[in-house]
UniProtKB/Swiss-Prot annotation:
This is Glutamate receptor-interacting protein 2. Residues 371-450, 745-769, 786-863 are annotated as: Disordered. Gene3D superfamilies: 2.30.42.10. The modification Phosphoserine is found at S43. Residues 424-434 have a biased composition (Basic residues). May play a role as a localized scaffold for the assembly of a multiprotein signaling complex and as mediator of the trafficking of its binding partners at specific subcellular location in neurons. The gene is Grip2. Residues 388-400 have a biased composition (Low complexity). PROSITE patterns: PDZ. Belongs to the GRIP2 family. One of its GO terms (biological process) is positive regulation of blood pressure. Coiled coil: none annotated. Residues 845-854 have a biased composition (Acidic residues). Residues 53-136, 153-239, 253-337, 458-547, 559-643, 658-740, 942-1024 form the PDZ domain.
Amino acid sequence: MLAVSLKWRLGVVRRRPKDDGPYSKGGKDTAGTDGALVCRRQSIPEEFRGITMVELIKREGSTLGLTISGGTDKDGKPRVSNLRPGGLAARSDLLNVGDYIRSVNGIRLTRLRHDEIITLLKNVGERVVLEVEYELPPPAPENNPRIISKTVDVSLYKEGNSFGFVLRGGAHEDLHKSRPLVLTYVRPGGPADREGSLKVGDRLLSIDGIPLHGASHATAIATLQQCSHEALFQVEYDVATPDTVANASGPLVVEIAKTPGSALGISLTTGSHRNKPAITIDRIKPASVVDRSGALHAGDHILAIDGTSTEHCSLVEATKLLASVTEKVRLEILPAPQSRRPLKPPEAVRIQRSEQLHHWDPCVPSCHSPRPSHCRAPTWAPGGQDQSRSVSSTPFSSPTMNPAFPCANASTLPRGPMSPRTTAGRRRQRRKEHRSSLSLASSTVGPGGQIVHTETTEVVLCGDPLSGFGLQLQGGIFATETLSSPPLVRFIEPDSPAERCGLLQVGDRVLAINGIATEDGTMEEANQLLRDAALARKVVLEIEFDVAESVIPSSGTFHVKLPKRRGVELGITISSASRKRGEPLIISDIKKGSVAHRTGTLEPGDKLLAIDNIRLDHCPMEYAVQILRQCEDLVKLKIRKDEDNSDEQESSGAVSYTVELKRYGGPLGITISGTEEPFDPIIISGLTKRGLAERTGAIHVGDRILAINSVSLKGRPLSEAIHLLQVAGETVTLKIKKQLDRPLLPRQSGSLSEASDVDEDPPEALKGGLLTTHFSPAVPSVDSAVESWGSSATEGGFGGSGSYTPQVAVRSVTPQEWRSSRLKSSPPPLEPRRTSYTPGPTDESFPEEEEGDWEPPMSPAPGPAREEGFWRVLGEALEDLESCGQSELLRELEASIMTGTVQSVAVDGRPGSRPWRRSREVGTSPEDLQELLLPTPLEMHRVTLHKDPVRNDFGFSVSDGLLEKGVYVHTVRIDGPAQHGGLQPFDRLLQVNHVRTRDFDCCLAVPLLAEAGDILELVVSRNPLAQSRRTPGAPGPSSPQMI
């Protein structure tokens, strides 16, 4: 067994003899080690010499807290030999022991004796400006395959005017003196020391997202002093992996030394080795003692801790053993296989979003040290090779975040005592604002001239009271300052709920926390809201983010590169619905706020051709999902965007435009058709004659609806489009796409016209619409006018095999026909959804003609002419009620007609009467034309049933409608009361014992039916065409229970 001793000292504070005075140093100071230091320091070559100015402000009667040695009468130049802990000079974090003092307030010390220097410092006044000479830190290490540079984000809280470390180096006019900004001292007990991640020799890359590449020492110090109470530092450090560890093939003994009180920085978990339980390193905290040693890695098995075997130890016991070590720990480990360790840095991915360079990989050469060796990407990240993200914070002006890898022990909220004002509870709830992504008015110019648009989304995070949500915010200069703009996400902890959700990125604006707007409050209140939410383990954030739209492909094949982090989804959902062999997979959904969504180039409906150059033509969907999950760092997607899926289709002879309709309490007068397949188009299949939509002149049958009230229908089935229309409100905005290179419904020879009634066979559109009611069910469709009219005959019938064919919207002479022209398309409750579109007859199929072309309805016993005139006038009056929005009066009239004394009424008000158009004999019989041109009839029946005394039921079962509310007869028992009373399957229950059930579902209707007693009175609507081809059947095993 090999023994490797790796010791890492965090720093030793050397005790010195008591000072003779506040600034003087006795003769002992020049002896021993200090004398060697003086000799070495007095011979600093010019190329290693740095100069800085230090300004200290001391109170009257107090001292600077530093000890000066040297002078013309002493051994060497004046220098700082000691900094009193807690003194002004030590807390300034601008001086190091060994620095030379060249001047005090402009007075040169070269020719002064030691006592003169001390007197000068005592009497200098409150403001002291020291010119300090120091030795430059060593240059960046040369390229070494065993030295890996890593980066870490560290959040520190300012104490006084410093963060507890001394910074030296920086850019210089003389290139030979240019150095990275290096931490040369970490003050014991200071903020950096208490946090525990920063060590001497670490290189500072950025402060609060401001890159320090090319910054001088003075600029870096000024940036530090201008930071707010809390700042985020991006630091680079080196990890050297010993050859013994790198080439080990068996157990090793690793000895790690640490400062008492500091943590090792590893967390343990349970695993197995050779089918035996084992204690394994789960993860290593970045920049911790263990991480910097390079000897341990995630996945290593710990065999013993300080000689105590872990073979029979539980996870809790092993963790306690590690926590009990003081200065040195001796671990016996079995290194994980080399294949599980990332030995070379991941490929850098850079995205430029502003004038400053932002990057996905935190180690971009232009943002860090001028030396190439500083651009090694880290090889460790929790859960895999993590990639950080950076998003410009437009439109709010704030420093752009440039985060790196996991923050070591960075708290998710300020740790200082907080006393927020109580205004957060009284602040108004945020009013939600919706911006249309379909309008150019929402586009803005982001940093660097990139075109973006902002979107908002809600993110729900589940955390715990101890670790919170892994989210840090930034806003304002002071914590108690009222925010003029929403706070930004400044840091996301790795493997936290905020990172795992995949919807948050650094730079996002947090508009509201649990419904309370952040713009009206302070940072203290925002942090307090997060703390309170952590106690409840859940928070709802409303965030605003930028979506790039500089390049939005409308068609063709292109590639998209997305950064991928292990454990975080890209936000893409792929589908293989109705996919045939050789066809590509379809992106069915993109999660709002995800990495895929923010690119602005991917949309639902895009075809996914390849992932990382792996073609998916013949791959099953499960294989494609597995490929996506296994990708790391960078995912390359090959996408094809078809023109049918594009909103902009000028190249294919189509035009898109927006139409705004105002209901004024009335219906829209349109009928839409589609399927439940997500990417099948939603088509306008019917328009009501002289209805609101038709009167605009901009909407026609065959037009495709792209969006409803700025909500895109891309990837949405018909049922969702129906719901959007039902909740659209008084003003409905439709985005329409019209194909211009072909007629919408081409008229063939023989179509009806004003010159001739019927010359040849009916057009195919009519045949397809009506004949399919006999032979093939059509797709479900809905008239959006129905929901805005309480009684606009939603008892619509069904065509053929349970499908609905839109009614011919022509002017009738009876109120029932007037109502039937506005029937809502109602899909059958038990019919499967179809994937084909069969247009029904619409008003576009019938050119508007004079009323003289229409004959009065034919009846076996025609009534007097006075009755004909009455119905015509009543129909006109009802149309007037529709146009002026008198919906309540219309409902009362319709209800009175529906509840009349007629037991069985056809749609025209008299049994058997149907309007039909006169035709000439041109080879087609009038009977055929009558069958094609007649509107689908609708019958209403009043049925009285008596309960079967033997079975104690009425002999029928009910079921819900497919896409709308409504209760339908499901089955009728043979020789039961329902069959004897004339009830048939697919009858819709409108009333049960004089209670309206039109808007009921089975949950409400079944109790009503059960309480009916021995007599049940029903009012039902029926489509005779649907019933003529169906016979009642006995209930099967899966049928609903008989009522």
